[in-house]
Amino acid sequence: MGIPSVEYMKSTPLILAAGAIFGAIYGTNALLPDIYDNPTSEVQAGSARIPGLSCAEEDGSTTAEPRWDCDGTQIRAKKVGVQDKDQATRRYLRAMGEGTAMPEGDIDRDGDKRTLSDGDLVAISIEGDGPTSFLSLRGPRAEELAQEVEKA
């Protein structure tokens, strides 16, 4: 191989310095908390809420259509003016699900609250003074959290 050239030897400290700088940046990034964590907020939309439950807002969450991730259970909300509350609850469940068929099953009614379940997906509508508030819950705690939804 031979003796390294002088030019090669001059660039070695620069390469080592660049490696040290990039290593320091990477190490600092790994040690510091992620400042881009999604904010946490109370699960409430329109006239529907789950008292005492605060979850991380999902990417794409807006004031008009908030979204939360509650330890693997996703919650979506929307306010819509509708005439037929039962039909609208079925349509909302279908829209949040993966199928195209209209969901069957009985809608549970409790005052202004309607609940329809299909596996790990639950749709809830709550009538308020204005538009009807809809919530969808999907995931391992969907049924449990659906029981906690109340009129705000």
Regions inferred by a protein language model and the residue ranges of each:
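Conserved polar/disulfide-associated segments of primarily extracytoplasmic proteins
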Residues: E57-F134, R138-L145, E150-A152
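N-terminal targeting sequences that direct proteins away from the cytosol to non-cytosolic compartments
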Residues: M1-T73, R138-A152
